[in-house]
């Protein structure tokens, strides 16, 4: 947010800080100031001039020869190329010797044989961005009001003797998205109460009820909606003070009605919207949910397709505005407007945020509604806006408002204690200092023995728990005043077994070719339930920053999918990621959620890229399966993993398996469903997710060192014909159980399916390796062990030896 230093000073009688000092002070209290720009730093010798005469340059069609009176005794001749320059205008003149932004210095010059002693300036030449210059002056010079005195400083007149503070407002401090909010923050810093904005004293006539009525169908989405009427208005340019305030805040002036709504938004942080009353086409406004595929053409001339869940303002039949986002072209205020219906409302942040994101339409209004606003300042903002429109347009302010009010006001009181504040902050703040801090913040403090009861004003809706109060105390007391303390301990530092295991896991996965990812624990309601290991309920935030970050995740995989999609959209086609992080499950009542540490991974694209030696190898199920099995081996886990084919929503039904260890399911591994891959523009993609605690709790095998075998091993190949639904894990287990002590390895080297084998049959071929560390094996030993294996396979699995 761009904040005018001079505007801040208007809230206080005696302001003690320079712009630079103010920026530093605000940063120290927790709101970052990204920069302070002195607008007049590169401006000098710029005054108001009056164009006495204007005629075409004799040798150039696009140049004008102007005689201009400035603060000098005699008028000067200036050659000007602006298409809108004319005699009788009050203009901005950079005199000879003047300095302008970009290092430009004005000199006496000759243009096509005619002397030019200065320059008539556009706003862009004074440093204003082109996007904030009024459209009427976008391609020419800026024409000042006729009443402006000739010869005075244009720098002062345009408010350029000012500094702009660029404030980086975090989502939790949306109260500072207004000048009133900034003034309260500054007041707490300099220990002064800011003056409250006052509306013009304009008499009212008539009743708003005679003009319009209001109906709200969903009070949850629209707790408050009101209309203020102003009639007999004249649409014209806003006064210079209003235009300059808007331009310095990065907003383009339009006319005296639209500019007032933008000004009130800046002043109070409360969006207003103006309708041309005569274009509404009805004497009734209905606020309702949009119908699916309903259409509206917005003020930017774009046709928008609405969805269920968007809130719209209608004339009872068709939409005239998207609530909290943008008005409709249908009811736009234009030069012919004579009566304005001024809207002031509170819309739910979720509804506005949803519409803004889905329509790709982010406005100053939607930003404030999405981040939250003070529900109890809307009447003040609406009254001020209506009175100011009446004053600037010469209109008649209609008495009263038409409103629907479903707000519920609750006093926000939070308890803490002086002892607790000092213990947590590590300070020795006295009670009198605490009282001063809350007085500076504008909070009401009640002391009952050692208990402090703090009543928080509605303008600070971000403060809801004790920790917020402690943060406010720390901010105003001064982070740099809090003493640095170190914990006293005599315990020698070291890594726990679980910390060592986690390091081993990370090192192994990175060695296997995966890159570590770090994603948000916050996600959308939709993603919160996707691909979870457990069916437990999700955890919703009470005050989410947005709908996209409204729930705590129950699985890491959806975030990795988004990360892969982001990379592939930027032509990074081979992606291999892993993340070790926390997932959350809801508990009954107000108990804290269950937290579990999970490990998740994703691979897509080619596992081996092509070079002069080999062709590229795409990722597949067995690549990721091998990585997971290698991880278990690296951790020294005694039990083997077992894989069981399962079906899981959003995963491929034929390429998904549960991961089982010591008889418990600890995770899953599989390919994404083709529909999911298509929705994220992914090619074949494989994912896994494992409960880390289950891995770390598994029995670790003791490391036993054996000498390298002195005797040779012997192998036997077995080809089995079995039912199609008999899996490799089952066959391998039977072989292990009956192979005896001499069997040291089993390797599956071939799988074949075909009509020649018979219906629902498949052939699997294994190599069995036998070894005796004490002596050389003889044929009889190996044959005896092999026969036992064959008999067991025939008896238990009805296998046919081929």
Swiss-Prot record:
GO BP term, pick one: phenylalanyl-tRNA aminoacylation
Catalytic activity: tRNA(Phe) + L-phenylalanine + ATP = L-phenylalanyl-tRNA(Phe) + AMP + diphosphate + H(+)
Alphabetical list of Pfam families matching this protein: B3_4, B5, FDX-ACB, tRNA_bind, tRNA_synthFbeta
Provenance organism: Listeria innocua serovar 6a (strain ATCC BAA-680 / CLIP 11262)
Name of the protein in question: Phenylalanine--tRNA ligase beta subunit
Organism placement in taxonomy: Bacteria, Bacillati, Bacillota, Bacilli, Bacillales
EC number(s) from the headed UniProt entry: 6.1.1.20
Gene: pheT
All copies of domain FDX-ACB, residue ranges: 709-802
tRNA-binding domain residues: 40-155
């Amino acid at each position: 947010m761009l904040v005018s230093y001079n505007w801040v000073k208007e809230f206080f009688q005696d302001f003690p800080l320079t712009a630079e000092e103010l920026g530093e002070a605000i940063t120290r209290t927790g709101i970052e100031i990204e920069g302070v720009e002195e607008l007049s730093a590169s401006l000098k010798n710029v005054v108001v001039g009056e164009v006495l005469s204007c005629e075409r340059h004799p040798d150039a069609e696009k140049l004008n020869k102007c005689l201009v009176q400035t603060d000098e005794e005699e008028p000067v001749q200036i050659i000007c190329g602006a298409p809108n320059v004319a005699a009788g205008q009050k203009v901005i003149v950079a005199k000879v010797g003047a300095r302008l932004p970009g290092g430009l210095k004005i000199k006496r010059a000759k243009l096509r044989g005619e002397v030019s002693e200065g320059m008539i300036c556009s706003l862009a030449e004074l440093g204003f961005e082109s996007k904030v210059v009024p459209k009427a002056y976008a391609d020419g010079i800026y024409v000042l009001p006729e009443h402006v005195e000739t010869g005075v400083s244009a720098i002062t007149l345009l408010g350029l003797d000012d500094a702009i503070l660029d404030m980086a407002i975090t989502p939790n401090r949306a109260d500072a998205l207004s000048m009133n909010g900034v003034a309260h923050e500054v007041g707490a810093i300099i220990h002064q109460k800011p003056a409250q904005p006052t509306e013009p004293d304009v008499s009212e006539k008539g009743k708003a009820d005679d003009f319009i009525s209001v109906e709200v169908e969903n009070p949850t989405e629209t707790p408050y909606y009101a209309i203020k009427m102003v009639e007999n208005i004249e649409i014209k340019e806003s006064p210079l003070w209003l235009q300059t305030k808007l331009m310095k805040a990065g907003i383009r002036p339009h006319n005296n009605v639209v500019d007032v709504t933008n000004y009130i938004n800046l002043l109070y942080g409360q969006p207003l919207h103006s309708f041309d009353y005569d274009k509404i086409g009805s004497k009734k406004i209905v606020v309702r949910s949009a119908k699916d595929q309903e259409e509206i053409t917005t003020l930017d001339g774009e046709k928008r397709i609405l969805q269920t869940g968007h809130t719209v303002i209608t004339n009872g039949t068709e939409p005239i505005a998207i609530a909290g986002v943008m008005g409709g072209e249908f009811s736009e205020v234009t030069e012919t407007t004579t009566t304005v219906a001024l809207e002031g409302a509170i819309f739910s942040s979720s509804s506005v945020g949803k519409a803004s994101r889905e329509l790709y339409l982010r406005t100053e209004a939607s930003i404030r509604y999405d981040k939250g606003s003070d529900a109890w300042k809307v009447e003040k903002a609406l009254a001020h806006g209506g009175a100011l429109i009446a004053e600037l347009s010469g209109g008649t302010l209609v008495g009263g408002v038409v409103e629907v009010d479903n707000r519920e006001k609750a006093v926000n009181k939070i308890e803490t204690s002086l002892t607790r504040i000092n213990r947590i902050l590590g300070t020795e703040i006295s009670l009198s200092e605490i009282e001063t801090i809350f007085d500076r913040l504008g909070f009401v403090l009640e002391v009952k023995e050692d208990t402090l009861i703090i009543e928080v004003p509605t303008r600070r809706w971000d403060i809801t728990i004790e920790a917020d109060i402690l943060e406010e105390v720390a901010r105003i007391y001064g982070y740099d005043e809090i003493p640095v303390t170190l914990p006293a301990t005599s315990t020698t530092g070291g890594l726990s077994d679980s910390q060592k295991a986690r390091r081993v896991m990370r090192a192994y996965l990175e060695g296997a070719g995966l890159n570590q990812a770090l994603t948000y624990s916050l996600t959308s309601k939709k993603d919160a339930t996707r691909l979870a290991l457990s069916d437990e309920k999700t955890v919703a935030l009470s005050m989410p920053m947005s709908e996209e970050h409204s729930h705590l995740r129950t699985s890491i995989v959806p975030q990795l999918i988004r990360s892969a999609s982001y990379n592939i959209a930027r032509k990074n086609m081979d992606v291999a990621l892993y993340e070790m992080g926390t997932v959350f499950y809801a508990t009954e009542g107000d108990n804290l959620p269950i937290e579990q540490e999970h490990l998740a991974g994703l691979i897509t694209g080619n596992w081996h890229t092509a070079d002069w030696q080999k062709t590229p190898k795409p990722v597949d199920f067995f690549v990721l399966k091998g990585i997971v099995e290698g991880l278990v081996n690296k951790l020294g886990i005694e039990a083997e993993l077992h894989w069981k084919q399962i079906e899981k929503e959003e995963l491929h039904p034929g390429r998904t398996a549960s991961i089982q260890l010591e008889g418990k399911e600890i995770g899953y591994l599989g390919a994404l469903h083709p529909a999911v891959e298509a929705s994220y523009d992914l090619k074949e993609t494989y994912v896994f997710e494992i409960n880390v605690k289950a891995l770390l709790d598994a029995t670790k095998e003791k490391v036993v060192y054996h000498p390298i075998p002195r005797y040779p091993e012997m192998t036997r190949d077995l080809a089995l014909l079995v039912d199609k639904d008999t899996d490799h894990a089952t066959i391998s287990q039977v072989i292990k159980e009956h192979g005896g002590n001499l069997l040291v390895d089993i390797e599956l080297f071939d799988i074949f399916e075909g009509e020649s084998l018979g219906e629902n049959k498949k052939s699997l071929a294994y190599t069995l390796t036998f070894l005796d560390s004490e002596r050389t094996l003889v044929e009889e030993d190996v044959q005896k062990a092999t026969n036992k294996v064959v008999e067991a396979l025939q008896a238990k699995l009805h296998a046919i030896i081929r």
